[in-house]
Amino acid sequence: VTPISRRTLLAAAAGNPRFLYRDYSRCLPDYLSGLAAAAYARRRREMAALTTVEAVRKRQRWARAAFWRLVGGEPERTPLHARTVGGFERRGYRVEKLVYESRPRFHIPALLYAPAAGSPPYPGVLFQMGHSLNGKAYESYQRCCQALAQLGFLVLAFDPMGQGERTYYPDASGTRTRLASADDEHSLPGRQMLLAGDTATRLQVWDAVRALDYLAAHPLADPARLASTGQSGGGTLTMLLAAVDDRLAAAVVSSGNTENVACARYNPPGATDDAEQNFVDGGPAGFDRWDLLCPFAPKPLLVSVSAKDSLGTYSPRYLEDGREEFARLQAVYRVLGRGDRIAWAETPLPHGLSYDSRLNTYNWLRRWLQNRPEPLVEEPPTSPESDASLWVSEGGNVVRAWNGETPASLLRAGLRRVGPAPLEGLLRVERPDAGLRAVRLARTASRGLTAEAIEVRSSARVWLPAWLFLPERPAPDAPVLLAIEEAGRNRRWRESELWQTLARRGVIVCAADVRGVGDLLPEYGRGNPRYTGPHAGEEDFAWASLIFGRPLAGQRASDLLALAAALRAHPAAKGRKLRLAAAGRMTAPALFAAALDGAIDSLYLSGGLVSYRSVIDAEEYTAPLASFVPRILLHTDLPEIAASMAPRRVVLAGAVDAAGRTLPAADVRALYGAANVEVRARAQWDEAALER
């Protein structure tokens, strides 16, 4: 006896025994959940196997190597060209203003807080900033640096990428960003870097390594007693540095991103964050954020968190996942015989470097770097300075002051081709199953045609809904049209609209949705809407897809391959050519699919991105991360992919630059010189464009 499916029961309960649409909004979240579950299970097994010192040491070596591999490789050390440009004295400490270069002409402004009392060499502390717009001038960060200096520590505080004097997208003032936040100063260039095989993670961690180079070599510092600390993004930067630099003797991570993306109760799209905190391909590699701290064991480590951070700053799973992974790392410390060197602290206060969190930092560093176990119960007197009084550069912007490099200029200068690579591998495409067929959910009449609601299974947990409009009298030589646009299949289905109009002219039309589009627009995650609302956009799902090794552009190309295969097998389409048409942000996946499927006879692209190189060359851009493919510019670009389709015809109508501006046809032709590519000046998405 064939069991009755849940879907059939629900349909019957609704009074309609024929069909019931799926909740397609679950498809992309469920697909990612499957990838997350596999990554979590793998890492859990591997961590559970760390029962000997030898196993731990092997894992530590693996974690460091995996980190450098994922972020783009360890850069070459170049001269720092450090120089002191000013300073001042305060009661109990003095401040030196200095600048150095983490890469040639890539300037890092920093402050060195030196104790006025005691005798050198002092233990050194690298203080790393959270995402404060004013960087090292942020009030609570100043207080911590001032207090540490008065407690006998030599402290180096530097502006991170895109913050303070390193604002790379300044407004008219020259010192404030014109972007929405410091996060955007990180992620705007960080997304560009992915196309060229680089990452914001690599840039940020190398800035920290070079800062530690300066601190370790300072005549007042004891290179055997170096630590790193920071709050929020600075805590995460401390984690990055702990993964790669053995010179650290202690660390305090305060409200850092201590949440794995692949966690026990993964809540799609998961704990994605700004660019440097997302490890592309980390999922299939078995690497996640807590692996950053594995190479640091068994050195003294304090992980300090805010109990309110799971209510909006980080994901709703932040605390429970952090505690679970802390226990795993604590077990590693115990295997190494130093369970006393790792601790967890919580504050009930909101996200910030609060007074109690600062005291925890002082006491941890005093205990392990100064051999002072007695707890400090009161912070030394502090008095934050004005932003301008801490400027190292004239005018408060190092790029303008010294005509230096930016992340974008470094990226453009360093871009090199390394040779061809299979497009299928870059995209991580999943080919459709042999014999794939569309499932007809319903069939109904319309004026002059028949409309079918069909569904195609593309991957595990992913079904693609589509409308198939079948003319009463199909034109004998007309190809089947498979059409996709970012507004989804329901945008133009009505009698007087595009799809039915084309069908009444004799064209078989399939208007479909792919992952993240139309009915497959993903549902919100569960939990506090202060977090789940802002983290439910396409970019968050694109980041999650990249982390789990399945670029969203590749997923959408896979969907189109499945739809094309199913259409070719449909009785009404057999023997007909297949034409694929895409508009706007769907053009890149369509080009990929057509290049990979030689049975797609022709391709029409309206209003699509002209090239990935145009994204690299743009200072600002609107091209979406969902269309980006990591490392693609090392091997190829969109014009070459279009040329690879020859002799099949490709039409580019109204191609746009990275900011979405329509380009002159002559400029597009200069890039697309292949004989099989026709360039049209204006984007069209109407009967005239799609019928021929």
Feature-to-residue mapping (PLM):
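Primarily recognizes the serine-hydrolase "nucleophile elbow" in alpha/beta-hydrolase
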Residues: 213-284, 563-635, 641
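Generic beta-strand/beta-sheet core signal
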Residues: 113, 128, 158, 229-231, ...
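Alpha-helical segments flanking ligand/cofactor-binding loops in enzyme cores
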Residues: 146, 239-240, 294, 500, ...
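Cap/lid segment of the alpha/beta-hydrolase catalytic domain
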Residues: 120, 124-209, 216, 262-267, ...
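Aromatic-lined carbohydrate-binding surfaces of glycoside hydrolases
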Residues: 158-164, 172-190, 199-206, 221, ...
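Alpha/beta-hydrolase-fold serine-hydrolase catalytic core, especially in secreted/extracellular enzymes
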Residues: 15-108, 289-291, 297-299, 304-465, ...
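N-terminal secretory signal peptides and thylakoid transit peptides that target proteins
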Residues: 1-13
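Alpha-helix capping and helix-loop boundary segments enriched in small/acidic/polar residues
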Residues: 132-140, 178-181, 195-203, 228-239, ...
